[in-house]
């Protein structure tokens, strides 16, 4: 499904929170949306592998990487796993790498920057916790919509028909 965050903001301005414009699209899907699962991890993506092995249909993984752009939390291998398990998208408050490969994949990936250095894989972090970045607090179960214009968040799903 295609989402237009500008239109959604016009229709639902009282019901959505707008994430500060810190992110760029690195995935092959221009827009995406779904119910979110939150993760908090710093320069370590081991926990992401565990979560992205789950069925992701209708879901978006929101990763609070502390805003670090020293190590990439998502690479092509991890993004392919997300595509294989039908995740709608990834929002990374941190960095990604292998961007040429990422843009070929049918998944939305919003992140702050790209860097060639990979993350550690020790599974240090927490999932299903409240995370805050971009002026917005994210809770697992909230609904996120993203496109090349921005990212918005709603407690409840928006009627997009």
UniProtKB/Swiss-Prot annotation:
Its main location: cytoplasm. Keywords: Cytoplasm. One of its GO terms (biological process) is negative regulation of RNA catabolic process. One of its GO terms (molecular function) is endoribonuclease inhibitor activity. InterPro entries: RraA, RraA/RraA-like, RraA/RraA-like_sf, RraA_gpbac. The keyword Metal-binding does not apply. GO terms for cellular component: cytosol. It comes from the Bacteria. The keyword Cell membrane does not apply. Gene3D superfamilies: Ribonuclease E inhibitor RraA/RraA-like. It holds the Pfam family RraA-like. Homotrimer. Binds to both RNA-binding sites in the C-terminal region of Rne and to RhlB. Globally modulates RNA abundance by binding to RNase E (Rne) and regulating its endonucleolytic activity. Can modulate Rne action in a substrate-dependent manner by altering the composition of the degradosome. Modulates RNA-binding and helicase activities of the degradosome. NCBIfam families: NOT-MenG, PRK09372.1, RraA_entero. PANTHER family: 4-HYDROXY-4-METHYL-2-OXOGLUTARATE ALDOLASE 3-RELATED, REGULATOR OF RIBONUCLEASE ACTIVITY A. This is Regulator of ribonuclease activity A. It comes from Shigella flexneri serotype 5b (strain 8401).
